[in-house]
Amino acid sequence: MASVPRGENWTDGTVEVGTHTGNLSSALGVTEWLALQAGNFSSALGLPATTQAPSQVRANLTNQFVQPSWRIALWSLAYGLVVAVAVFGNLIVIWIILAHKRMRTVTNYFLVNLAFSDASVAAFNTLINFIYGLHSEWYFGANYCRFQNFFPITAVFASIYSMTAIAVDRYMAIIDPLKPRLSATATKIVIGSIWILAFLLAFPQCLYSKIKVMPGRTLCYVQWPEGPKQHFTYHIIVIILVYCFPLLIMGVTYTIVGITLWGGEIPGDTCDKYHEQLKAKRKVVKMMIIVVVTFAICWLPYHVYFILTAIYQQLNRWKYIQQVYLASFWLAMSSTMYNPIIYCCLNKRFRAGFKRAFRWCPFIQVSSYDELELKTTRFHPTRQSSLYTVSRMESVTVLFDPNDGDPTKSSRKKRAVPRDPSANGCSHRGSKSASTTSSFISSPYTSVDEYS
C-alpha cells in the first residue's frame, strides 16, 4: 500500500538503508519516510536540498520536510477531528449494542468488531502516523515501531472482513432464510478467525520492523530481506486481500440481495407484516451498502498513490507529493469516523442510542419512544409452529361455481386448495407463487429487531 514520499537510498557511513517504501503500514504505520539524498536536485517534497559533501550528509541527516506553521495547524486540526469522531463515535456504537439486549443480533456483533477495529486504528495509529509523516522523525521507540507496522494491517483486515461477514449473513438471511442463522458461539468463532488471519497477514511487518538511529534523526522502517521487489509483492498481496477481494464478494452478494429486495413485490400482497419486514430489511441492506461504498472510496486514492509511486519513483520528487500523501492518508483514516454517523442517520435504534449517550447536552431530548426503541423486543408471530406442522394442518377451502345457484345444493365442487404454509397469514392474489416469493421475507429464526 501507499507509502510516504521517499528519496533515494542513503547511508549512515556504515550500513546502507534502502527506502523500500510502499506498504499499508506506511500509511497506517508510515514505516519508511527516509531522509533524502542531498544533492543539486529538489527533494521529494519539492524543497531545495542543500548541496553537501557525502561526509557531511552522513554526519548531518536533519529533517528537510518543513512546512509552514499554518499548514501544520490545518493538518493537525483535520487529523484531530478524525481521531475524536472515530474514537468516541465507535465507542458509543459498541456501548449501544452491548448495553442493550435488543441490539445484540448477529449483524450487530459484527458491527461491534468493526467499531473496535476502527476505534483502535484511530486511537493508536492515526496521530502517531501523522506526526511521523509530518516531521519524518520517529519519537516513539522500537517496540511501538513494531506495533505501528503490525497492528494497522491487522485492524484494517478485521474491519473489511467484518463487513464481508455481514454481507454474507445478509445474503443467507434473505436468499435462504429457512436455514438456521449463526449462533452467538458461531459468530464469536468467525470473529476470532478473522483476527487470527489478520495477525498472520501482518506478522511480516512486525518481524522486519527496525529502528535506525542516525545523527539528528531516528527512523522506523521495514527492511525486507530480499529488498524492494519482495516488499512490493507483499503489499500487492495486501491490497488484494484487504481491498479487492472482499469488495468483490460484497459487490456480488449485495447485488443479488438488492435484486431480491427491490426487484418487485408479490402481486396482491396485503399483509402488513410482510411490508414491515421487507422495509426493515431494505433499510439494513441500504445502510451496509453505504458503509461499504464509503470504505471503498476512502481507501481507493491511498492504494492508487502506493501503486503509482512504486512504479513511477520520480513522483516522489514532485513538489507537492507530501501534501498528496497527507491528503490520501487523511481520507483513508477518515473511513474510521463515518460509520457511526451513517448508523445514526439511517437506523432509528442507533439514533435513539446516540440520543441517550448525549442526553447531557441541553439541545438533545430523549423521548419515551427512544427509550422503548432500545428496550422492547418485537417478534413477528410468523411460523409459530414448524413448517412441517403447518404443512399437516392444511385448511381445505371448497370453491363453488357461482352459476350453480344455491351452493348448499351444488354437487360441482372444485378441487380442494391447501393453505400455503409460507403465506404467514397474508393474502396473495397474484399469479406469482407466494411460497417462493415470500420465502425470503419471513423466517422462523429471525425477528423484526434483526433488520430494523
Swiss-Prot record:
Alphabetic keyword roster: Cell membrane, Disulfide bond, G-protein coupled receptor, Glycoprotein, Lipoprotein, Membrane, Palmitate, Receptor, Transducer, Transmembrane, Transmembrane helix
Lipidation (S-palmitoyl cysteine): C361
PTM entry text: The anchoring of this receptor to the plasma membrane is probably mediated by the palmitoylation of a cysteine residue.
Entries under PROSITE patterns matching the protein: G_PROTEIN_RECEP_F1_1, G_PROTEIN_RECEP_F1_2
Transmembrane portions of the chain: 72-94, 105-126, 147-168, 189-209, 233-257, 287-308, 322-346
Comp. bias (Low complexity): 432-452
Compartmental location: Cell membrane
Record topological domains on the Extracellular side: 1-71, 127-146, 210-232, 309-321
Disordered: annotated segments: 400-452
GO BP annotation list: positive regulation of blood pressure; positive regulation of flagellated sperm motility; positive regulation of heart rate; positive regulation of uterine smooth muscle contraction; regulation of dopamine metabolic process; regulation of feeding behavior; response to cocaine; response to estradiol
Record topology, Cytoplasmic segments: 95-104, 169-188, 258-286, 347-452
An annotated GO cellular component: plasma membrane
Glycosylation sites: N9, N23, N40, N60
Record's keyword annotation contains Cell membrane: yes
Matching SUPFAM superfamilies: Family A G protein-coupled receptor-like
PANTHER family reported in the protein's UniProt record: G-PROTEIN COUPLED RECEPTOR TKR-1-RELATED, NEUROMEDIN-K RECEPTOR
Family: Belongs to the G-protein coupled receptor 1 family.
Protein name: Neuromedin-K receptor
Species for this entry: Rattus norvegicus
